[in-house]
Swiss-Prot record:
Its main location: secreted. It is found in: Secreted, Cell wall. Keywords: Cell wall, Secreted. This is Unknown protein 3. GO terms for cellular component: extracellular region. It comes from Ephedra distachya (Joint-fir). The keyword Secreted applies.
Length: 14
């Protein structure tokens, strides 16, 4: 999506 933490367009910060 657009939140850092969800694997979408940014690095999946789990």
């Amino acid at each position: 999506g657009a939140d850092p933490g969800c694997q979408d367009v940014v690095t999946p910060v789990q």
